[in-house]
Amino acid sequence: VRQELKLELKQGFKSRIEDVREEILRKRRAGKLPGDTTSILKQWWQEHSKWPYPTEDDKAKLVEETGLQLKQINNWFINQRKRNWHNN
């Protein structure tokens, strides 16, 4: 009986451990945007380098073109301006 209980517990936790492992891996990958989407954003950035603040319409188009969420677009531009834009 004890051996059966041990085996039962092991089987139950095994699937949960696998679920947690997959979730961790998925969250790690979440940090970087796909290259094809960043190339679209970078192209917009280069075309508007003097004033890289997209309008709401610009953002809506970028959401449509990239498939990213509006928050991701906003964060990308915030980070890009902090890292790469020097307003003269």
Curated annotation (Swiss-Prot):
The keyword Lipid metabolism does not apply. Pfam families: Homeobox_KN. One of its GO terms (biological process) is regulation of DNA-templated transcription. Residues 25-88 bind DNA. Its main location: nucleus. GO terms for molecular function: DNA binding. GO terms for cellular component: nucleus. Keywords: DNA-binding, Homeobox, Nucleus. Gene3D superfamilies: Homeodomain-like. Residues 4-24 form the ELK domain. PANTHER family: HOMEOBOX PROTEIN TRANSCRIPTION FACTORS. Belongs to the TALE/KNOX homeobox family. This is Homeobox protein knotted-1-like 1. It comes from Zea mays.
